C-alpha cells in the first residue's frame, strides 16, 4: 500500500474513532475528493456515499468475495459495464485507476437507478446484494415504492444484516453529502427523494 493510500484510508478511520470519542473531524469524516472525475449525470452525493461505505476511499480495496477498488465492483459486473460503455476492460485498473473504477461504478449505479425508477433503497439493495436477491425480496416482501408499504419497515425485513446496514449507512451519508456539496441544509421530502414515493 502506497503512502497516499495509507493516508486516505487512515484519515477516515481516525475521523470515525475521533467522532466516537466526542471530537468529530467533519472534513475527514465525509471527504469530498475533488480529484475524482465524476459523471455529471450521476448523483455525486450517492457516488461518494457508496465509495465511503464500500472502501473508505481506499482505491486498492479487495473484498473476500472478489469485489475491487473504490466502488467494490465485481469483475464480471465491471466487464459488462465496460462493454456497454465501449471501453477496454482492464481488471488491474479497478484497483489502480480511481477514475476508471468510478466511471464503471457510476454507470452501474445509474443503470440501477433507472431500472428501479429512481428508488435509492432498491438501487442500494441491488448494488450490495445483487439484483437476483432483490427480485426475491420484492416477491416475498412487496415493493416499497407502492403505497401501503413503508420503505423503512421494508428495509428492516431484508434478511441480510449487511444489506440492511448498508442501505441505512449510505442513505445517511447521502443526506450529509447533499448538505456539504450544496452548502445549505435542505428540507426536501426525504421519502420521495430517497425511497421513490411519499409516505
Predicted feature locations:
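Catalytic glycan-binding domains that act on GlcNAc-containing polysaccharides
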Residues: 4-199
Amino acid at each position: 500500500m502506497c503512502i497516499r493510500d495509507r493516508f486516505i484510508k487512515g484519515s477516515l478511520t481516525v475521523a470515525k474513532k475521533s467522532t466516537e470519542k466526542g471530537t468529530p473531524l467533519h472534513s475527514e469524516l465525509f471527504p469530498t475528493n475533488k480529484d475524482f472525475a465524476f459523471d455529471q449525470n450521476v448523483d455525486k452525493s450517492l457516488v461518494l456515499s457508496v465509495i465511503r461505505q464500500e472502501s473508505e476511499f481506499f482505491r486498492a480495496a479487495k473484498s473476500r468475495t472478489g469485489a475491487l477498488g473504490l466502488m467494490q465492483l465485481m469483475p464480471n459486473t465491471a466487464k459488462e459495464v465496460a462493454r456497454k460503455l465501449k471501453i477496454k476492460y482492464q481488471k488491474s485498473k479497478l484497483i489502480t485507476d480511481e477514475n476508471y473504477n468510478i466511471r464503471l461504478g457510476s454507470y452501474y449505479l445509474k443503470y440501477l437507478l433507472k431500472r428501479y425508477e429512481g428508488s435509492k433503497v432498491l438501487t442500494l439493495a441491488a448494488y450490495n446484494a445483487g439484483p437476483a436477491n432483490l427480485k426475491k425480496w420484492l416477491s416475498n416482501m412487496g415493493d416499497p415504492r407502492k403505497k401501503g408499504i413503508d420503505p423503512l419497515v421494508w428495509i428492516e425485513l431484508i434478511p441480510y444484516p449487511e444489506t440492511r446496514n448498508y442501505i441505512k449507512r449510505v442513505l445517511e451519508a447521502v443526506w450529509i453529502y447533499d448538505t456539504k456539496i450544496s452548502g445549505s441544509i435542505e428540507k426536501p421530502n426525504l421519502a420521495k427523494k430517497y425511497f421513490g414515493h411519499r409516505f
